[in-house]
Curated annotation (Swiss-Prot):
Name of the protein in question: Small ribosomal subunit protein bS18
Gene name of the encoded protein: rpsR
One Pfam short name: Ribosomal_S18
The keyword rRNA-binding belongs to this UniProt entry's keyword annotation: yes
Function, in words: Binds as a heterodimer with protein bS6 to the central domain of the 16S rRNA, where it helps stabilize the platform of the 30S subunit.
Subunit relationships: Part of the 30S ribosomal subunit. Forms a tight heterodimer with protein bS6.
Origin species: Xylella fastidiosa (strain 9a5c)
Amino acid sequence: MSKFFRRRKFCKFTAEGIKEIDYKDLNTLRQYLTENGKIVPSRVTGTKSKYQRQLTTAVKRARFLALIPYTDNHDI
């Protein structure tokens, strides 16, 4: 038996019944970004691939519209 117990990852979007991820919802998007501004992979967050693709598109749109910075060198 392993020493450490890993908590099961679950998809937050599936649990809350969210149909589509909005690029204007900055608080949700920031939960899936690292300190440096990189998108956290689904194997770490437990997000389903459908929502991970939507999340990636939403983050890229928000970056393009200057709602979220590309790197950590800029203030949020």
